[in-house]
Amino acid sequence: MRKVVLLLAMVLGFVSVLAACGGDQAGTDPQTNENNEETTHEGNTAESLEHATLVWYLIGTPQQDVDQVMEEVNAYTKEKINATIDLRLLDWGEFNERMQVITTSGEEYDIAFTSSWANNYALNSRRGAFVELNDLMDKYGKEMKELIDPAFLEGAQIDGKLFAVPTNKEVGQQAVLAFNNELVEKHNLDISTVNSLADLEPLLKVIKENESDVSPIATFDAYLPFDSILQEEMPFAFRIDGNTDEVVNKYEEDVTMETLKTMHDYYKKGYIRSDAATSTDSWPLETPNWFVRKELYQPYAESIWSRAAGYEIVTRPLHEPYVFNNSVTGSMQAISTTSKNPERAMMFLNLLNSDPYLRNLLDKGIEGIHYEENEDGTIKDLDARIERYNMPSFAIGNQLILKLYEDDPADKWEAFEDFNTNSVPSPVLGFYFDSNPVRTEIAAINNVTSEFSPALLKGAVDPEEYIPAFNKKLYEAGMQKVLDEIQSQYDEWKANQ
């Protein structure tokens, strides 16, 4: 139900409030002059800038020690750019709705988390909620621009304009099958031959016959090889292979039928739980009651998952990593058009994404209180970080300047760079659909999709019976009009590339 509410909010949108952008015409990330004063690229010392307080809305569960850490952060940012940060964490379940209210009310703020899935980047950018950043970044964000993978900066542009600073992390999106390695080794199973959903059958059979307390499959939506428009479960998509210039209804494609037939076969054989379509079980890693699950990968994700689970997890890829709009806009920071200090906000984002001290302070907390640093520069969490300062690392900023944990591979960030280099751009990377002309039809189609897709994608119903009924209702809801509108916008976009 939460996905339905989020999507409807994204589609129906809200009234944007435009405000004049003012603020100090100051420089960017400070440097040290001959008198050991902090200076900007414009030659101003930090002290010469009028003090600014920047309001920053960030997604994540509020943490007990935020105020303590922000005292250290603000001492540093005041010295560097004469600004202090008013960090406001909004919990995961309320962030999207709260940001809509904040935006429609015209409340003044400076920076906010935005993405393809929360505080929607494309919709807010088109409706004037975010400041265009191209010139600001060139003037005040030079250091971070050198560090952020160009694929993020290019792929996140809407009609040639960038409206938020992407988090430098894994740029590609890759679905993998993750296995409970205790069960793999116990039954001497060979996962090296698993390259698709269909390849799982003999392994699932062994688990079903020998592990009565284990679900062979931890419930997941089947992977389908498309670049989706709007949400993954929605029907509008472009193919990754073949004719990539035609928008399609993915539920009319042969590969979808074959994949969902496999899922339903597994469901009938008891490899998938009988309540898969309605269950809210999140399948926590620390509970080893599963054999295989689908996850989104990043380099050395196995180490992260194994650390969280308390037992080893191993993986097999379902496809090569692709760069989608959703992956380049998965975590970003935007500057509000209501901000009175957009230049200073950009200076802060530049510092956040290029200064390892500030980035680690916001992410890990205070050394000696929240974490300890080893002689080799690696770190380990203390109880205070786990219990009182567990921040959403991916949502803050540049991942590749974070300290490594003591059990992280030494080449972790180099592996990220290799992963990004080898990620393949989607044929439609950079095309952002404006849903406003067909928002009524999309709302109706969303209702139909929420009725049919959960059971279909999880294998709980026969696709040969269910998909025809699903498609009939989609077209009754206005499917063809939406497909035509997407195609028209795409053709215009493609002609201008």
Regions found by a protein language model. Give the residues of each.
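Sec-dependent N-terminal signal peptides of Gram-positive bacterial secreted proteins and lipoproteins
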Residues: M1-Q25
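Extracytoplasmic/secretory soluble proteins
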Residues: V17, G22-Q497
